[in-house]
A protein has these predicted regions:
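Class I SAM-dependent methyltransferase SAM/SAH-binding core
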Residues: 36-123, 137-141
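Glycine/Thr-rich phosphate-binding loops of Rossmann-like dinucleotide-binding domains
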Residues: 58, 134, 163
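Short catalytic micro-motifs in class I SAM-dependent methyltransferases
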Residues: 128-131
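Conserved catalytic-core motifs of eukaryotic protein kinase domains, centered on the activation segment
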Residues: 135-136, 159
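A short glycine-rich, Lys/Arg-flanked "PGG" loop and its adjoining helix->strand segment in the class I
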Residues: 137-152
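Conserved class I S-adenosyl-L-methionine
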Residues: 152-169
Length: 169
């Protein structure tokens, strides 16, 4: 139906933009702020699921700034975005602080239809990706299911009146 068509069009638009998203200031800054909030929580997050939006920036900054991450699952609807992440972090990514190897898994899926098992990640991060989703409560419920008990879901999302001036222009 219409929802599937719109979802497909959004995916195509993301794939067109993914090649230029590496230097996007807004994505970099939003990611920095989300990870700054993550730093306020003094517990380890070894397995992190990154869904949609600033996937490239988030994975890159996790490798640069987190001392505890061991596994990152990069989930995006755009194959081009996932390939860009792989190009940037390489085949054998390591944490910047200690050179510890980090396993990265790549999953191509829509945010509201995650093919991730229940109770497998400590943290779910989504930076500016959930505003694309047709079923936001469903997507958040799917993300919650992937979390271990006492896991953390942390997201930055555009609100209804965000960037009004740009939409009008």
């Amino acid at each position: 139906g219409v929802a599937a068509y719109l979802q497909r069009k959004k995916k195509e638009e993301k794939e067109k933009k993914s090649s230029s998203s590496e230097g996007d200031f807004l994505l970099e800054e939003a990611t920095r702020r989300v990870l700054d909030r993550l730093d306020d929580i003094k517990r380890p997050f070894k397995r992190i699921l990154v869904i949609g939006g600033a996937t490239v920036s988030t994975v890159k900054q996790l490798l640069e700034k987190r001392r505890d991450v061991e596994t990152i699952i990069a989930c995006d609807s755009s194959e081009a975005t996932l390939l860009l992440v792989k190009d940037i972090v390489g085949d054998a990514p390591k944490r910047k602080f200690d050179g510890f190897p980090v396993e990265i898994k790549y999953v191509q899926a829509f945010e509201d239809d995650l093919p991730i098992k229940d109770n497998v990640v400590d943290c779910v991060l989504s930076v500016l990706g959930l505003h694309w989703v047709n079923d936001l409560p469903g997507a958040m419920g799917q993300a919650r299911c992937t979390l271990v008990p006492d896991g953390l879901f942390l997201s930055a999302i555009f609100g209804g009146d965000t960037l009004t001036e740009l939409r009008i222009a």
